[in-house]
Amino acid sequence: MKELLASIILAVVSLTLSAQNSSVLDQVKADPKKSYGNDYPYLYKHDTELTKAPKGYKPFYISHYSRHGSRYYWNESLYKQLDTILTEASKNGLLTAEGEAFYNRFMDAKQELMTGISELTQLGWEQHQGISRRMFDNFPEIFAKGGNVLAISSLSGRCVLSMAAFCQELVQCNPEIEIREQSSRFTLDGVVPTDKENPSKRSYPKATPRFVKNRDRAGSSDPLHNDILRRVFKSTEGLPFNGRRIAGSLMSLYTSLPNIGHEGMMGDIITDAEIAARWESSNLGSYSWVFSGQYEMIPVLEDIIAKADAAIDGSSGRIGDFRFGHDSCIGPLTVLLGINGADRDPEDPSEVKNIYQNWQTCMACNIQLVFYRSRKSPDDILVKCLLNETEAALPVETDSFPYYRWSDIREFYQAKCSDVK
């Protein structure tokens, strides 16, 4: 019977993943900005439908983790480096006409860019407002009567403001919701355990994905770097930094622009189609780092389990626990949880795109674990996982996808954490 159930579950999960990933490259063609990876601005699919809970089950609690919303570039090095390179090239007559036009637009925006380094943008604020309101609308049974919520964030301002946007919107939906917001070293272990300010910081082993030893199968030819340099510079001789680094910085700027309202700044120096053409290779690089750091997110998973237990037994009295952090946390957490097969660790590089797509770790990306209680048996708890507000598969057996028994999930993840320690 167990073998039959396992086969059924595998079939269901495979069909789910197939529906999501059968045309991954087609998805990139349809929306080339997805190839921006973790620079992709959050985009909610308005046609998303959620499966009704099995009869007799009612949602009562949500555990959530979200990345901050759209922001300016996260540190000053990119803007300073490009300022230095472009200014030197312009002074020495090394810019093409297209490069000079871009340089002028860049300098016009320079003060704004340098002032805004790492800060949340209006778009980032609005992303979290939308996620919050849809959460309220999707699960009215949880929020209708109000209740207590704990929200914690990293010490970064963009995360604190993302938390504020989300929580303010939720309270506007129902003023009876009481939210305690906290950005503190006391709570870092549950949201950014790797932060140097975390007094409980621990060391965990790094993991290496198996595809790395077969990376050469994916090929390494990438003419885009040279194409970009030819469009901007007559020559790069004598400029600080090597050509490949300069081209890489220009691509980093390009993919960041939609988050700060400056699309078009670079003209035709780079196109979405060109970024999309190299997406699969870029995605391999992304999978390497999210896979590598998965075990460092064990404290977050332990926090999720502990707070869920407290909500279930009533000791916390909360209807929600919300966390606001970074891609460096939610990406590895996605792998640790094995969402949509992200933990499968394929040997073939060409298979990686089918179990992880780096646009899923976009600006304001989020994981929601929604808990349902049986009206007949209070200890009978189901959980549904949403990745970016879309139902997702977990690596645990179930006979009612997308719903899983909390007892099974809890046991599975506790064992996974214990195996690493």
Regions found by a protein language model. Name each.
Residues 1-23:
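Bacterial Sec-dependent N-terminal signal peptides
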Residues 20-148, 154-321, 325-421:
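Signature for phosphate-centric chemistry
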